[in-house]
Swiss-Prot record:
Residues 1-301 are lumenal. InterPro entries: Pbn1, PIG-X/PBN1. This is Protein pbn1. Keywords: Cell wall biogenesis/degradation, Endoplasmic reticulum, Glycoprotein, GPI-anchor biosynthesis, Membrane, Transmembrane, Transmembrane helix. One of its GO terms (biological process) is cell wall organization. It is found in: Endoplasmic reticulum membrane. Belongs to the PIGX family. GO terms for molecular function: enzyme regulator activity. It is a single-pass type III membrane protein. The keyword Endoplasmic reticulum applies. Glycans are attached at residues 36, 56, 112, 206. Residues 325-332 are cytoplasmic. Pathway: Glycolipid biosynthesis; glycosylphosphatidylinositol-anchor biosynthesis.
Amino acid sequence: MDLQRTNQDTGTTTLFKVVISNTVNYLPKGVWILRNNTIDSLSIAKQFREIKNNINISHLSRENYWVETPFGKVFHSEVVSEEFMQIFIDKGNKALNNEEMIFACMSEKGWNVSLETVPNLDIPVGSYETQLGLPVGLHPKLHVHLKNLHKPEDECSLQGFMYIPPTLFIDRYELSNIAEMHADNLGHVLGIWGETDLEAPSYKLNGTGSFFWFDIYTDDGLLQKDYIDTIIPLHTRYQSPLKGQTYLKTSLTNPKFFWNCDTEDKVNDFRFLFSSKNKYTLQNDPTTLSISIPIADLSYKHVVEWVTNGVAIFSFFYLLLYLWKRFRYAKD
């Protein structure tokens, strides 16, 4: 589907996509909605309610659960209910398999729904593997091994897009410095949107997470080697204490890597990720990585309070005693 033509013909104000497979798309698996900044979230939620009652996409109608980008506001949910998908499958009048995705446009005239199939490419464009560097610790490093790389067209650039869950964050300043030096083969940082506060704990945020879009540095020498390795540094956020637990497991979905061969618009527009053009997507297993984040155990809350207060009181009287002795010796 030609994205620009669709917008022009139907007056579309909202783009909507459900990705059920992590192997054939620019976007990771989940519900993705992109809307114009002039539309409010309540209007979007109303449109979904009119399709069928009791559609439960958490936080859809709340403005602070939409991530603002220069190209519009984005809603993302990793959870896709079967009921939610079935509505749009019915509107597309076709069964959906694992190599397809739902693509829908909402305009004043209603919904225009289609089911997209990404064709098998005659040109092998590459694949990739990911793993977390050991030890994982509080500052995990995502190691990416891109291999069997073949640039489909001369003007194509190798790009990656990933969703960062609210339990983790990336440091835009750290990444900018890495990209400036082309360290770890990281090229330009095309965009970081969402919850990017470097100090805020998870319980102080809305829980939308963040999106990271970036270039991989390539040259003829690297492509001749047939593989490129890169490292994406991540950081864990402070979590709320839980009773009986000392670790909180969080999931990190694999990033998506693809060749961006869109020469019509040199501006890296988020809407490109919703289009069906140039599906030169690198293949990988749709695995999810697990990270264990240390947290405080509420079972020991009272013990910690008593010990902390005891140390503070002891330190206070120790300092008083020390000062009194100094004063006494000075007087003598």
